[in-house]
Amino acid sequence: MKNVQINIGAVVKEEDEWDQEMGPFPKPGVATLRDWDFKICNRYKIMYSPADDTCTLCTYGPCDLTGNKKGACGIDMAAACGKIVLVAVLMGTCAHTAHGRHLYHWCLDKFGDMPFDMGSEILVDAPLYRTILGKKPKSLKDFGEALEYCEEEIVQLLAACHTGQEGHYMDFESKSLHSGMIDSLGKEICDMLQTVAYDMPRGAADAPLVEIGMGTLDQNKGVLIAYGHNLAAGAEAMIYTEEHNLWDKVDIGGVCCTAIDLTRITETGRESKIPANLGPKAKVAGAMGWWRKMVRAGIMDTVIVDEQCVFCDVLEDCQQRHIPVIASNDKIMLGLPDRTNDSADAIVEDLVSFKMPGVAILDPVKAGEVAIRTAVAVKPKREQYKKESLFTEQQFKDTLATCTECNQCAFVCPPHIRISEMISEALKGNLEPFSSTYEVCVGCQRCEQTCPQEIPILKLYEYANREYIRNQKFKMRAGRGPVLDTEIRKVGAPLVLGQIPGVIALVGCSNYPNGTKECYDIAKEFVDRGYIVVATGCMAMDMSLYKDEDGKTIWEQYEGAFDGRNICNIGSCVANAHIHGAAIKVATIFAHRNERANYDDIADYIMSKVGACGVAWGAYSQKAASIATGVNRIGIPVVVQPSSVIYRRTFMGRTDKPEDWMVIDAKNGNMQQIEPAPEAMLYIAETKEEAMLEMAKLCFRPSDNTQGRGIKLTHYCDISMKYFGKLPDDWHLFVRDVKDLPLNYQTQMMKELEEKHGWKIDWKAKKFISGPLRPADVSFDPTNIPRKIRAKK
């Protein structure tokens, strides 16, 4: 043969190692799963809440998009909102994927390639990787291919946002859902890399209890705070402290998700290049919402920041209090000089002498060393500055007296704290309002910026709560990591059939509408009702700050298995991927669905059969948007707090449109109208009580058997009676058989069904003659995907 070129690519041996055939969608592109996305968007109507009526993204603008007007490029209001939603979701996706890319390079540089081993009780070891890529990772290097895939998709998605590209709102939403899926894979890559490299727990229900709270940090030692989401530099600080035997001189605490991940290091006892059982020596200072309160309290001597969710004025805040700052990641450099190539001695000297307020050090090893040495050396030098930065009693009273009660602060406060009234009470000697609203304050400092008297309100809070700060000492279970296959085998059937009423996932940030106590209240409500409750990130931290009458935090009250009446701390934000993973495992382990490159099939199973609901009750960031959107694509609904209207979009079902609730019965291909289950994909609740009621409802699934539906309906009605004093208005939509009815309300409900809704009932036999949308049928196999039909009539 002449002029023939033969190219041989990678030799694939996957078929010999996997008992599943390759599914239809390995590495899905932007449009590959568009049909599935449209199924979601057609059932759950997109509702937009634009922040304004104009578009200013190109120089033809500003363009007025009110009514039926279009922009100069031809875009309408719906598409303009869809574009902004996509950009926001992409920001979150990029943050997690870039985090994964940094960890990938760092872990390979520090540890070399390592076998990917999640332990003997986890065989479905990277569910999202397998479901999306259609491959199994064998070593850390294999995650490079997944990162390349994520990065390619991100580029294509962002390109669609350019003026003159995508112009239809439904396709923008499909692209947002695709970005959300990429985000979920990016998170899984992050947590799998650090779990293996840093020997973190692999599904440990009995992960150790670690210390949380500002009061846990020993003020007799130098205190280093590691702030952000990437553990690399903070871990090096811990390793340096351990290797130089400095724990008697320094305390290390974390803020935000770095805090959770530092407490997970080397907890399994496996052979590691890192000192054993290092994690519990770190402490969790608190979630992101406590950051400015911590600074005002002066609890730290040095701060090392990495990436994500770091307040942009961190340097200014610390500089005012002579707290050196070290930027350890190129995503946050704060205008600081790059001292990566300078000697550690020279950098420490400049920081301890306050010649520089901070430095950037992009080598995690050097950053960790400098951070520890600086914290120890600067501690005695900061004592006088710390005293000067804190109010005395007289300064507190004098500052209170300057308030004119103009109430401008209350108008800008996100949780609407009546600050002027609080100050007025304090002038009378009553500090209780300062105490009771301390955990409600989100630490945004808008009040300070708007105050015409320039009152430092957060400093007032610090003085009024100084005893609480000293005694803020609680216990939190360290992040356990993924859900075990053995746990899924135990809960799969009762979860799908409804005997376990659902999985409740508390995730996200610290921008709560009414304080951190709501995290605890929501978690306790559902764990007491027998739900499987999982938590990650800031919500996991914030629910730790409360004790019962026996002095136990929620983590001490309940066990940490993935089971009913248990509560699991899965880990940091990136560990949210394991919640996706648990749902995928129900499909593949319990139902024997092939997950390999079979995303829409798995998502269809989850949406139709796995009772689960997420709540991001403090959502503030673009990462929260990408997390929720990724969860939505895999078929799990999410409830968010009222300020989430700023995200601009919800997915709401219309119960008055029967055509939206038609599904296929896979056993015979017949179309069947179902109850609105789940009723929404993204729901904005106004209050904690409304959120809990909606969460219970969003755990309904068409596959519930009569016992399971009865259990779910009981909790739905109980929550409504407990918080609203009446049965929910729509309970009858979820009744298929008399056996579905809660025993406590059965007679009352049957009368209402007959008298109010016109159902015909055989009272003697206790049967419905007519009325329900469909009968309870244990053989009913709902699906939205035609290829799942087993036999057509």
Curated annotation (Swiss-Prot):
InterPro entries: 4Fe4S_Fe-S-bd (IPR017896), 4Fe4S_Fe_S_CS (IPR017900), CdhA (IPR004460), HCP/CODH (IPR004137), Prismane-like_a/b-sand (IPR016099), Prismane-like_sf (IPR011254). Its EC number is 1.2.7.4. It is an enzyme of class 1 (oxidoreductase). Transmembrane segments: none annotated. Keywords: 4Fe-4S, Iron, Iron-sulfur, Metal-binding, Nickel, Oxidoreductase, Repeat. Residues 393-422, 432-461 form the 4Fe-4S ferredoxin-type domain. [4Fe-4S] cluster 3 binds at C403, C406, C409, C451. Heterotetramer of two alpha and two epsilon subunits. The ACDS complex is made up of alpha, epsilon, beta, gamma and delta subunits with a probable stoichiometry of (alpha(2)epsilon(2))(4)-beta(8)-(gamma(1)delta(1))(8). Part of the ACDS complex that catalyzes the reversible cleavage of acetyl-CoA, allowing autotrophic growth from CO(2). The alpha-epsilon subcomponent functions as a carbon monoxide dehydrogenase. This is Acetyl-CoA decarbonylase/synthase complex subunit alpha. It comes from Methanothrix soehngenii. The gene is cdhA.
